[in-house]
Amino acid sequence: ARQHVGNEPFAVLLGDDLIDPRDPLLTEMLALAEHTGESVIALMPVPPEMIDRYGCAEVVPLEAGLSVAGTGLASGEATNQVRIKSLVEKPAPEDAPSNLAIIGRYVLQPAVFEVLERTQAGAGGEIQLTDALATLATMPTEQGGGVTGVVFQGRRYDTGNQLDYLKAVVQIAAERSDLGPAFRDWL
């Protein structure tokens, strides 16, 4: 991917995380990345017993008074924008720094490629993006580091989970203006 994005920030959207396209999550993430010059990850609260399925974030509110262009939000003032202090991949519930799971939306700065090259295999014996992001979170913004997050409260389906996949198909089909009425009648 490095040769395609060059020295520009880029978005990564994992295919098994389905988020309502009408939701402004990615728009907010792009605006935050442009404003801060840092990578941005999407986070979502999950029950403690599910945190071991996800990367997990330790966060603090963004600095009060930081206006985030294009979002109409000022961080630190009852917003959903946070600074990432640390990240851990698939922690045991008792070791998790929070209940904020990393979900499949990222806006990454190009420095992530160099960090990934230096990242050792982690959870599952694989090089984990979460581990590279944890390193970026400790680096100065001037070096491509720093990571912020947007806490998502909208509708999301993990289509790698069979039940969530079925829920997504039914819900989205039922809401379509062209197919919804006939589909709902059939149901």
Where is each model-derived feature located?
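Conserved beta-loop-beta/alpha segment of the NTase-like Rossmann-fold superfamily
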Residues: 1-60, 65, 108-110, 116-119
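Low-complexity, intrinsically disordered Ser/Thr/Pro- and acidic-rich segments
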Residues: 69-73, 77
